[in-house]
Amino acid sequence: SGSCTLETCWEKMPSFREVGSRLMEQYKGSAKVTGGNDGGTLIPEDSTVKPPSELDLVYSMDSPDFCEPNPRTVHSARRGVGCNSTSMDVGGCDILCCGRGYVEETVIFQVNCRCRF
C-alpha cells in the first residue's frame, strides 16, 4: 500500500498600493553612486553611506530642478501640474509649485462605470 501527497505552492502579487509604498520607501532611501574602475562596482558619492546591495535603489545623475524654467520648453516650469493641496510630502502643492503659490481648481467629471447591480 502507498500514499500520495500533493503539495502546491504559489506566490501572490502584493497590491498596487503596497508596491507603490515599497517603491516610495526605496526612492526616499536611494543613494547617488558612481561606477567603480572594475565596471561592476557601485560606489556611493557620500562616504557615510554603505555600498548598495543588489536590491537597493540607486541613481547616477541628479534630477533637473523642475522649479527653474527650462529654456528648451515653451511653458514655465510647473504650470498645469496637478498636486495635492493637503499633502506636505513629495506630491504636495507647496513642494511641486516651488513655494510660488498655486490656484485650486475643482473639476467634476462623469464616468460611465458600467456597474451592474
UniProtKB/Swiss-Prot annotation:
The keyword Glycoprotein applies. Its main location: secreted. SMART domains: WNT1. Disulfide bonds join C83-C98. It is found in: Secreted, Extracellular space, Extracellular matrix. GO terms for molecular function: cytokine activity; frizzled binding. A lipid is attached at S1 (O-palmitoleoyl serine). One of its GO terms (biological process) is neuron differentiation. Glycans are attached at N84. Palmitoleoylation is required for efficient binding to frizzled receptors. Depalmitoleoylation leads to Wnt signaling pathway inhibition. The keyword Cytoplasm does not apply. GO terms for cellular component: extracellular space. Keywords: Developmental protein, Disulfide bond, Extracellular matrix, Glycoprotein, Lipoprotein, Secreted, Wnt signaling pathway. Belongs to the Wnt family. Ligand for members of the frizzled family of seven transmembrane receptors. Probable developmental protein. May be a signaling molecule which affects the development of discrete regions of tissues. Is likely to signal over only few cell diameters. This is Protein Wnt-6.
